[in-house]
């Protein structure tokens, strides 16, 4: 019934007035029912009841039709016009009571539908209202000044009290706390934050007062981007919703064209009286009205988008959410998408006979790596630091050799395997095995003799493996794209469980692989997080950016997962499938109701009151069916 594009101006401008007038009209209608034989007074009261209760419906029927016709330069009637004409026609026949009843039922359903459709909109508004407005700025003299968030500049320092909202994106420079980041990524478990850790605007400071240095303008924060994406998503309708919107004026025009044929046919072919034939035409206007059909897609789509936004998955439009269920292939960038994005120690080994010295040697290894800023060194330190004692070492980083230190005339060296000439057989065999598993190996030597190794790998994250398993269960072909060597790429691919791996891929080649998948498999999605993923994200039917990724990847993608958790993309796929199923249910149900009412009208069974009651009831059923998507999908 409702015009989905927001023609309900009565909601925005004095939204209580239509409700007050509706109940005034309802009261007049009931007064008229009890006036007995005072026919003139009754008809006046019924007419006033219809005008007061349905003035906004009449206005939208004639006013919007005139405006849309003028803008489109062709006749563009709407559903409200059908109801208005049916009410006017009924009054012209002298059935003022039935005319008023039609408008009252239609208006009552109108308010219920607006409320129901507004529920998904209100859920989105709740999210947008989380946007912080004020901040406690620390001035140059150390005093605290409350300012609007828009006044903050990069480099400013702000104080965030216990239990307060963090006003903007920044980095902690004083204090420690636990932050609830559910407004950003949908995760309810607070994250520990210490000096140097990033924080995001709109999140809630939990357990301690902190000082944050502003790192982004208020318009560029993560939450500001979320607001932008959510607003954009409401404007971009699903394909089926767009088709229904375009179809509505054509359908209503057809109904209006059929109306005189029914009136003439009833009188000339079926020997009905002109009054009865005209009445059947009026019932047809109501029965054929596509109210429920018009509400089949938009409320459901907004509900799905709202649900996913609360889970930290942002769609830039309803069309992308609807299309996700149709994807036949998904291509994944490896680093940071399927893997954690940072190397971790997976294995370490010392040659036989050094069991008693293992703790000592691990301590030397760890303290040597502390002197390096290489990612592999960081991974080794993270793995062993808690288990070792600190040593004061002089470490030299020699190009082509590695890290070298001397302790009491004993020289220790850490380097890549190719920098060592002689290697024990056990180390050599393990190196071959570990390399076949896609792991990077570094050697540890004492006095030029290799005595151990450490293997590292950018390991797959568990959420990614579970997500790949889910997508494969949905018959979606999964592909991993990586710039790594073939051996490493295929090893990671086996661990994650993807169907195929493209290794040694240059950034500019990723888009060509997406083209290949589109040609061979069908609708293809691309999931990535880096600048080099941007061309492929744009080229894919659906581009998905992981939230820890670069701004350019997020800007060009159609979907943003605010946390690097692919299980959330799997959840979005389930919501998409459920959305399409609900929309199909709504369309079939609404068409069956229209067909049933038209048949009952031709059989002479349906009257105006019955038709409008069933018709508006079916519209409410369709809307509430769509609102089920506000509830989490299993």
Task: Give the location of each predicted region.
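Membrane-embedded alpha-helical bundles of multi-pass transporters
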Residues: 2-16, 29-35, 60-66, 70, ...
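P-type ATPase nucleotide-binding
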Residues: 350-474, 500
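A short beta-strand structural signal in non-transmembrane regions
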Residues: 210-216, 442, 479, 552, ...
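Conserved ATP-binding TGD loop and adjacent catalytic N/P-domain core of P-type ATPases
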Residues: 409, 452-585
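Conserved cytosolic catalytic loops of P-type ATPases
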Residues: 126-212, 216-217, 319-365, 406
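Hydrophobic alpha-helical transmembrane segments
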Residues: 43-67, 101-114, 119-126, 238-332, ...
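Actuator/coupling domain of P-type ATPases
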Residues: 2-3, 33, 46-132, 157, ...
């Amino acid at each position: 019934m409702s015009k989905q594009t927001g023609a309900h101006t009565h909601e925005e401008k004095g939204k209580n007035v239509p409700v007050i007038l509706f109940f005034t009209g309802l009261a007049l209608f009931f007064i008229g029912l009890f006036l007995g034989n005072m026919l003139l007074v009754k008809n006046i009261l019924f007419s006033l009841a219809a005008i007061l209760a349905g003035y906004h419906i009449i206005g939208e029927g004639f006013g919007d039709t005139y405006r849309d016709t003028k803008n489109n330069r062709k006749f563009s009637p709407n559903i409200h016009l059908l109801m208005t004409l049916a009410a006017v026609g009924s009054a012209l026949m002298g059935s003022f009571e039935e005319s008023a009843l039609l408008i009252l039922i239609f208006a009552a359903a109108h308010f219920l539908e607006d409320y129901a459709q507004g529920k998904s909109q209100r859920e989105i508004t709740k999210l947008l209202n989380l946007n912080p407005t004020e901040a406690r700025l620390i001035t140059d003299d150390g005093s605290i000044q409350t300012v609007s968030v828009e006044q903050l500049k990069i480099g400013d320092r702000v104080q965030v009290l216990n239990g307060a909202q963090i006003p903007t994106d920044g980095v902690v420079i004083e204090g420690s706390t636990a932050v609830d980041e559910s407004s950003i990524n949908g995760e309810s478990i607070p994250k520990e934050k210490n000096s140097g850790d990033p924080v995001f605007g709109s999140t809630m400071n939990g357990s301690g007062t902190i000082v944050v240095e502003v790192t982004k303008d208020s318009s560029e924060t993560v939450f500001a981007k979320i607001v932008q994406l959510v607003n954009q998503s409401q404007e971009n309708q699903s394909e089926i919703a767009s088709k229904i919107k375009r179809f509505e004026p054509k359908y209503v025009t057809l109904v209006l064209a059929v109306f005189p044929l029914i009136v003439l046919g009833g009188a000339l072919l079926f020997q009905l009286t002109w009054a009865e034939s005209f009445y059947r035409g009026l019932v047809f206007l109501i029965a054929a009205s596509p109210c429920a059909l018009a509400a089949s897609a938009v409320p459901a789509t907004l509900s799905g988008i709202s649900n996913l936004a609360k889970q930290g998955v942002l769609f830039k439009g309803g069309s992308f959410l609807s299309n996700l269920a149709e994807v036949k292939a998904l291509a994944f960038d490896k680093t940071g998408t399927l893997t954690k994005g940072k190397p971790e120690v997976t294995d370490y080994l010392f040659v036989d006979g050094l069991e008693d010295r293992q703790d000592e040697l691990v301590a030397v290894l760890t303290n040597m790596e502390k002197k390096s800023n290489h990612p592999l060194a960081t991974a080794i330190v993270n793995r062993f630091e808690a288990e070792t004692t600190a040593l004061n070492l002089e470490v030299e980083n020699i190009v082509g050799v590695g890290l070298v230190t001397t302790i009491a005339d004993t020289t220790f060296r850490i380097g890549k395997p190719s920098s060592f000439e002689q290697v024990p057989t056990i180390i050599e065999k393990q190196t071959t095995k570990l390399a076949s598993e896609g792991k990077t190996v570094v050697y540890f030597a004492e006095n030029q003799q290799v005595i151990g190794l450490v293997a590292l790998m950018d390991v797959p994250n568990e959420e990614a493996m579970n997500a790949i398993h889910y997508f494969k269960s949905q018959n979606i072909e999964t592909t991993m794209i990586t710039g790594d060597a073939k051996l490493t790429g295929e090893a990671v691919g086996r661990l994650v469980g993807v169907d195929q791996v493209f290794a040694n891929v240059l950034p500019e080649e990723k888009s060509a692989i997406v083209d290949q998948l589109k040609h061979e498999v069908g609708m293809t999605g691309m999931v990535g997080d880096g600048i080099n993923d941007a061309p492929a994200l744009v080229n894919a039917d659906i581009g998905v950016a992981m939230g820890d990724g670069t701004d350019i990847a997020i800007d060009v993608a159609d979907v943003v997962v605010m946390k690097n958790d692919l299980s959330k993309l799997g959840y979005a796929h389930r919501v998409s499938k459920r959305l399409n199923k609900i929309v199909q249910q709504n369309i079939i149900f609404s068409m069956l109701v229209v067909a049933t009412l038209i048949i009952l009208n031709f059989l002479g069974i349906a009257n105006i009151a019955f038709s409008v009651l069933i018709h508006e009831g079916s519209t409410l059923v369709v809307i509430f069916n769509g609102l089920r998507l506000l509830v989490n999908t299993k």
